[in-house]
Amino acid sequence: IFEPHDLSLRMSSDHLFGLFGLLSSMAMYGREADLYIYGPQALGSVLNFYRSFFGEGMKFDIVFKAVSCKEPMLVHSSRNVNVSAFPLDHKIECYGYRFDSIPTARRPEITSYAYCSDTAYKEQLSEWLKGVNVLYHEATYQHEMADKAAFRHHSTTVQAAQCARDAEVGRLIVAHYSSRITDFEAYLNECKEVFPNCVAAQDGDVFEI
């Protein structure tokens, strides 16, 4: 829907280290178009480090756009799509992203989806995500572990489903499971009791937007 961009969610190793491999692959395959990367301010220093030590021979520029907001903020707009960032509730600075297509004469309907990674339950999300077609929302724990979820700034199955229900989204995708989750049928049923149109994603799954 738009030229490749990278949207960084937060500054932690599991969200960050794969970026170096992505940049190296783009350079190896001769990318020339600028690459726009959005994320927390601190990510700029990491990208400068990469360019200093591994950027020789790169044919494309990395254009870093810092994200810092307390409510939804438009971070990218093209003829096809608007992308907004919004703050999540985690132990460190963390953002989600919403994508809204721009209607055209041939495609007058608006298609939208949103991605909420690491976050505790946050009531404002249902307002910010109102009406999206597809919502990905982390659901690290089953609801019996709501206290642990709150302590670790993550969400439960029921909380993710409540967000989807209150936001009146079309479909909910949950993932980011704790290693404690062994009964995926019970896990998914907890979500479906609140929001029936829900699927629990597995590695390698592909979803049509």
Question: Predicted regions span which residues?
Answer:
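Active-site metal-binding motif and surrounding structural segment of the metallo-beta-lactamase
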Residues: 1-36, 66
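Active-site metal-binding loops of divalent metal-dependent hydrolases
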Residues: 11, 42, 117-119, 139-141, ...
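Metal-dependent catalytic neighborhoods of phosphoester/phosphodiester hydrolases
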Residues: 18-25, 182-190
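Short internal beta-strands
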Residues: 34-42, 173-175
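General small-molecule cofactor/ligand-binding pocket signal
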Residues: 38, 63-68, 84-86, 199-201
